[in-house]
């Protein structure tokens, strides 16, 4: 079960011609093509997000999907499964940061459809290089160290593509935790606009 469903989840009751039908709030919003990516990015959560993306594509391949992000980041491989699916499916995926989009959360935010990446005004965005820790034989540690450097270079290259920043700037700015306000995230190219009110 996803952590989002561990707490009490509100139910929405709809009147239909066949009587009443109740949905949990997230399932009801899924009908409106809204997906929530909240909390730590990990395999189970990523599988749920990927499944929802694929389902919404099958429902209507020409209508935008809205991915709301409030995440401190997490697993690179789990995040990349979401990212690759966002790029793979036919519908545009519009990303919206609410609260925070850090690390892999920021990467997914930037990976939304060009011109359709948004941030709410009091949200924070943070980019940095991937983290990892290893133990074991020296040769294995060396292999893992090389792998994390390969991942770092790949993430930097993709961030450069999505932001329009030179790769050298991305490498410098992700060397340490780099926090940005909503306006700074727009200026940097991680998102396209700050949304203060619906309809903007």
UniProtKB/Swiss-Prot annotation:
GO terms for biological process: protein quality control for misfolded or incompletely synthesized proteins. It is found in: Cytoplasm. Disulfide bonds: none annotated. Signal peptide: none annotated. The keyword Lipoprotein does not apply. GO terms for cellular component: cytoplasm; endopeptidase Clp complex. The active site is at residues 103, 128. Its EC number is 3.4.21.92. It is an enzyme of class 3 (hydrolase). Keywords: Cytoplasm, Hydrolase, Protease, Serine protease. Transmembrane segments: none annotated. It comes from the Bacteria. One of its GO terms (molecular function) is serine-type endopeptidase activity. It catalyses: Hydrolysis of proteins to small peptides in the presence of ATP and magnesium. alpha-casein is the usual test substrate. In the absence of ATP, only oligopeptides shorter than five residues are hydrolyzed (such as succinyl-Leu-Tyr-|-NHMec, and Leu-Tyr-Leu-|-Tyr-Trp, in which cleavage of the -Tyr-|-Leu- and -Tyr-|-Trp bonds also occurs). The keyword Protease applies. Its main location: cytoplasm. PANTHER family: ATP-DEPENDENT CLP PROTEASE PROTEOLYTIC SUBUNIT. Fourteen ClpP subunits assemble into 2 heptameric rings which stack back to back to give a disk-like structure with a central cavity, resembling the structure of eukaryotic proteasomes. Cleaves peptides in various proteins in a process that requires ATP hydrolysis. Has a chymotrypsin-like activity. Plays a major role in the degradation of misfolded proteins. HAMAP family: ClpP (MF_00444). Belongs to the peptidase S14 family. This is ATP-dependent Clp protease proteolytic subunit. It comes from Vibrio cholerae serotype O1 (strain ATCC 39315 / El Tor Inaba N16961). The gene is clpP.
């Amino acid at each position: 079960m996803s952590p989002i469903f561990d707490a009490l989840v509100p139910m929405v009751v709809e009147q239909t011609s066949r009587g009443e039908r109740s949905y949990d709030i997230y399932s009801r919003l899924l009908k409106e093509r809204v997906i929530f990516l909240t909390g730590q990015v990990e395999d189970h959560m990523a599988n749920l997000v990927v499944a929802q993306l694929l389902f919404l594509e099958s429902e209507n391949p020409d209508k935008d999907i809205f991915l709301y992000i409030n995440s401190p980041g997490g697993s690179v491989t789990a995040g990349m499964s979401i990212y690759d699916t966002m790029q793979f499916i036919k519908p545009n995926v519009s990303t919206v940061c609410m609260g925070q989009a850090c690390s892999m959360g920021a990467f997914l935010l930037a990976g939304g459809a060009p011109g359709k990446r948004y941030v709410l005004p009091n949200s924070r965005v943070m980019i940095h290089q991937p983290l990892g820790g290893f133990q074991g034989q020296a040769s294995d540690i060396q292999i893992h160290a090389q792998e994390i450097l390969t991942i770092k270079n790949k993430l930097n290259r993709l961030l450069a593509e999505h932001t329009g920043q030179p790769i050298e700037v991305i490498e410098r700015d992700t060397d340490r935790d780099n926090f940005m306000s909503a306006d700074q995230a727009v200026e940097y190219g991680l998102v396209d606009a700050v949304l203060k009110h619906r309809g903007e």
